[in-house]
């Protein structure tokens, strides 16, 4: 204390020394309390406001020294010993586990659904977690207040309560990557150490945190950029705009909680009206007076709830803000200076905390519902009394307990045994967990009170699967179902109200496809007996062949040969050709074929097996093909060419074609020139034959060069020739007197460099036989299917086709093609090599059509299938007809029991149920049984007086003083659940029984944090908007079944009807008065709708100008408050004025609907102020004013719609902005900061402000401060039409070059 005292005295002395201050500051009060982080902040802020920066810095230094000195003396350190675990933790955990055990028991008895159990578990753990946290704090507070961990967290130096909780309490529940909460909590803390399971679960949460941070930084940066762009041109340009407008400040509330107090909102503002004390009527403060901390406190203490202050939202300064409307600059707690770039400051203040907002809130399955309902626990033991007029309806809580829900506000009373009496107020919708006259213990939960209006939480439909924990038969008990068929014909079954699905235990065998049961319901089977069997049947029949190497993974193969063909005279040999193996086929007639399909592959109908090797139809070069008597048809694939139907002669006129595709300059010969063989026609290309050259070129690119062999005859006049070019000339036919060919030639006229000539081109003839030779073959065929090889001749070219080639060309191919006499075209033949029966060294080619059947491997008892055993019924070489059985697979029972559940009719999943002795339970009785045979009993129900059932089940028989139960499990399904099974179905363990449909609270607002801020500032339509009241009045609410019928009736009797979308919850009640713009259903409001509703409502009474102002004012207030709510909920404090500046930029424009007599265009976006001035002018001249609607622009839209096209273009959509500006001939007046930075001028803010402000004469400033203008440096400004050329370089400064070197 002495140290602190000395310190304060020092401050006073320093203050006294500061003689510059007009009045000596009051002595420093002695602050006698613990100083933590918050008090420290206040202390420094107070000193800063009172004594300025220098002394505050000195004081902060002194505080630092003080802190370190005592920390060192006290030896504050941290060791693992300081992590003291509260002793009551074990007992709290045990208590929670007992509660959960009870809930699980209720679940197994079928009293609550899976969802209710899950909800109960999660809520229990959350409560336990909180209790442990409280215990931890109180443990520290009482037993170890100087614990270093506790001091650190408590003072706010480092860490917070939730982190300390993880160190010494329990870590709590974690969410998995889908955002579902895992119902296994982490019960340990870091001091005790986590188990392996807990460690893995906890790493989920950690990963989520990291990913989130990474995404957040990017989003937050982009938000800041957009904010800077929208508000960069807001600069303080005037001292006082003189407006009498203002906004009403009131404390920002969220339900019953004060989020921002009025006092906090008032500090640093300027009053727009005098403030009068409500009781004494004395004036506390005048208009235009600044509100400091003391005045704010005085105003709040006088009980004033609303204060009219000036605000950037209502400032009338042109394109800027005046000092009075902005208020204090938060940097130094004095009125803001002229030329301050408040827009940029606002943008940074809103953008910077972005990284601290959590991004995605995970749908945590209704964990945060604790915040919505306030729990009432009994302060003492006693009896609960309800009033007579209490209206309630029965209600099932989210934990599956029965409770009562209040239909109207009321009270309940708790009476203690010693005459104590406590009255609890209950609001409508509250839940009572006890009945009238019930005895309650101390701290027992009596009721949960809903907080009115706060229930802005919306709910969403979610589904949860119910899974069978045992195999058996489904039995519905008291479960009415409703079937719906949709347009696609899918049927869904839903439960009409809640009921039970029982699964009666038994062994369920899944039958493989095609298996038929061989037992009947009620048969008794022993282990190993056959329950069902399946047969393996051949489709086509044939001869059985059992390959040796046929044991594959899945079982043994059996092959059945349907048909076969052998080339019994041809032998197969293998040759190595270019490093690859080739199979060659030598026939008896001396032909050699090469196999196109290698042995071991399959070929289908009409596919090529082999091709004849021959050189008779090979040409030297390319050429022209002509058919003489040959007939072809296209069969099979196009690339295989044309099949010859009738033989004849192929005529072949050779020519050599070189594809060049090079520049024409490389050509060495001329078109029509005759060249010798071996001439270099183009660089690096030589011709092989002598002949006439034809050059084909296009766009100076040499495409092709053709050399046509033949004899060239120059003629004087080609007109003498009677035979047309392109004709075939027979030997001895006279052309001209001197030319008589001695062989078949093809006539062509050419233009040579020497003149016209005739080219006689030789023609070669190739004879094609009608039928090719086929090697002999013998076919064996079962089941009447024939298979053979057919020889086919194919020509690859059509008649008259020009074949471009330099090398040889094959004109005819002879191929062997497989032909299956087809009634099953999908069959394929296998190609095999077999040894000759007489000479094993000779191999023959065989083609077989096979059917391969797979025998199952014997399965040793798998859980669901039972054990299978397969028997083969045929042997090698057997001949089998169509549909013959080859093997049988038997499914054997694993345990003895009684067969049940065989259903007639075609079921998709074939299953058989065997009820074994394991599924039965015998309970000895002492007295008369109180149940009858067939009854379904739950665990804990009495079978006889004093004998509870050990398990749930169905009573099978009662005899000889004992009851036989068939084990079963009940599952409770809620109304509306989608059923996945029908009554009597057989299910395996792990099958889905039903999907429970339930509503869960969306955590807080659907989107929180950054995305919500972005949604507000971009003025996006929220996903699930609420319905807003369009006119004030009283709600009239009636229900048609589930559908609400909602009307609002005004004072004059006008009725407005509202339609409520499904999934929206009403937050108004019958008879409630509502104002215009109030929400009627839950969900976030759409700001565009708000604006439209307010504008339309006020327009009828006030006219456009006032209506637009009021509507915009409401939306501005809504946006400012919503943004504040998000930031405050995350613990971030931002001054209202920053948000107001941004919101002002968003709400400054209107859209012209009808231009009247003005020069505006319909649809144009104009500043509200501009259009009001224009309309005022019209009113004077008597023209028709423009009609308009106010619009709300998101920050991106607003940035792109600024006056300055340079600023807009540098933000986004550069091309569009610049082209539009160019078309409209816009000029940029360089008013904002960004434009000037881009062009490289001095920015008109800070010291540069006065440089530009000289143009407009300012009214004399009323402040006593000296003006900031430096008079001796007047800027030289030339105003030239619409250009603004400015060189504000004073004369006596260094020239540019020197200046840049500095």
Curated annotation (Swiss-Prot):
It holds the Pfam family RNA_pol_Rpb1_4. Binds 1 Zn(2+) ion per subunit. It comes from the Bacteria. It catalyses: RNA(n) + a ribonucleoside 5'-triphosphate = RNA(n+1) + diphosphate. Residues 1-29, 1253-1302 are annotated as: Disordered. Zn(2+) binds at residues 241, 315, 322, 325. Its EC number is 2.7.7.6. GO terms for biological process: DNA-templated transcription. Its cofactor is Zn(2+). GO terms for molecular function: DNA binding; DNA-directed RNA polymerase activity; zinc ion binding. Residues 1255-1267, 1280-1302 have a biased composition (Acidic residues). The keyword Cell cycle does not apply. Keywords: DNA-directed RNA polymerase, Metal-binding, Nucleotidyltransferase, Transcription, Transferase, Zinc. Residues 1268-1277 have a biased composition (Low complexity). One of its GO terms (cellular component) is DNA-directed RNA polymerase complex. SUPFAM superfamilies: beta and beta-prime subunits of DNA dependent RNA-polymerase (SSF64484). CDD domains: RNAP_beta'_C (cd02655). DNA-dependent RNA polymerase catalyzes the transcription of DNA into RNA using the four ribonucleoside triphosphates as substrates. Belongs to the RNA polymerase beta' chain family. RpoC2 subfamily. In cyanobacteria the RNAP catalytic core is composed of 2 alpha, 1 beta, 1 beta', 1 gamma and 1 omega subunit. When a sigma factor is associated with the core the holoenzyme is formed, which can initiate transcription. This is DNA-directed RNA polymerase subunit beta'. It comes from Synechococcus sp. (strain JA-3-3Ab) (Cyanobacteria bacterium Yellowstone A-Prime).
